[in-house]
Amino acid sequence: MSKTTIALLFGGKSTEHEISIISARSISGAIDRERYRVVPVYITHEGAWFSGDSAAEILSLDLSSIMRKSSVGNTETLLREMIRNSAEKPFDFNFRAAGIDVVFIALHGSYGEDGRVQGLLDTMGIPYTGCGVSASAIAMDKALTKLCAADAGVATAPSITLDADSYLADPEPVHELVDSTFGYPLFVKPASLGSSVGISKVHLPAALPEALKVACSYDRKILVEAAVSGKEIEVAVLGNDRPVASVPGEVEPGSDFYDFQDKYIHNTAKTFIPARLPDKLLDSVRCSAITVYKALGCRGMSRVDFFVNEENGSIVLNEINTIPGFTDISMYPKLFEASGIPFTALIDKLLHYAQEKPEAAGR
């Protein structure tokens, strides 16, 4: 039987560049090499594409360990140095000429999870894992996601959306608006970033200007959101027209909230699979995850995160990730492992869904 050739796309022009490499390394290790041939395709911070020895060398790095011992800035320097020392030159990757059958997108954040790469692949007629252009673009924007979820009957946290340029030009009216609209603590978030990059939990009005300034440095669209009490619950969803939801998992942050440092550097958060909730509430969370998935028109995969209050039974959407992490601490593969789908089988299913006809999958 001939092998299916996969282009494993990782790196990218995103603040989540290093996390993408760690995810791709895990995915590469889980792919069934009896059935699939893997072609690593690395995208640099500047957007140059490499495939060959340099891409394979970067993919082999234990970047997770390196990040825990060093800073993200140092890992970025290391990656740039490896490319500079490589004899290879960047190129415009021709998927068809390379005999690629399907692309596994392991890019996180901007220029990978937001519909841009998906549109490029659609134009070339190359199948790929995960959501299509529209679902990817909507899910990347937290404000648009909230609108779609609310329209589908899923609760979201009260929030206001701000324009970064307008705020920086005249900040005081925004401070007054936030103070009159919300109590403290509250969250300030870039609208279109993942891995909790640029997010601040603000406990006092005096800390609001700095939190807004940080968010504005990452995005032109900012979300100010009320803090919601409850457990942080994550649900993995898999499939196209008939998606299935995993057993829900629970994250207990090791810091004030589940931020980038807690996720990838200090690794102090505790996880519980299944989540410590009554069965009836677990079922309701799974149903809500499917509702959000369908409302956004997702396909292939997503991880849907909620805040669940066990006392009053409220389920509030936090966010949806259309290319969830695949690192060794990531919940998406862990949740399906606990639901009876091992990592290698999960990768196989994702590649299968990627190659379904677009009209059948609703792309």
From Swiss-Prot:
GO terms for biological process: cell wall organization; peptidoglycan biosynthetic process; regulation of cell shape. Keywords: ATP-binding, Cell shape, Cell wall biogenesis/degradation, Cytoplasm, Ligase, Magnesium, Manganese, Metal-binding, Nucleotide-binding, Peptidoglycan synthesis. Mg(2+) 1 binds at residues 305, 319. Its cofactor is Mg(2+); Mn(2+). Its main location: cytoplasm. Disulfide bonds: none annotated. The keyword Metal-binding applies. It catalyses: 2 D-alanine + ATP = D-alanyl-D-alanine + ADP + phosphate + H(+). Binds 2 magnesium or manganese ions per subunit. It is an enzyme of class 6 (ligase). GO terms for molecular function: ATP binding; D-alanine-D-alanine ligase activity; metal ion binding. Pfam families: Dala_Dala_lig_C (PF07478), Dala_Dala_lig_N (PF01820). Its EC number is 6.3.2.4. Mg(2+) 2 binds at residues 319, 321. GO terms for cellular component: cytosol. Residues 146-352 form the ATP-grasp domain. HAMAP family: Dala_Dala_lig (MF_00047). Belongs to the D-alanine--D-alanine ligase family. Cell wall formation. This is D-alanine--D-alanine ligase. The gene is ddl.
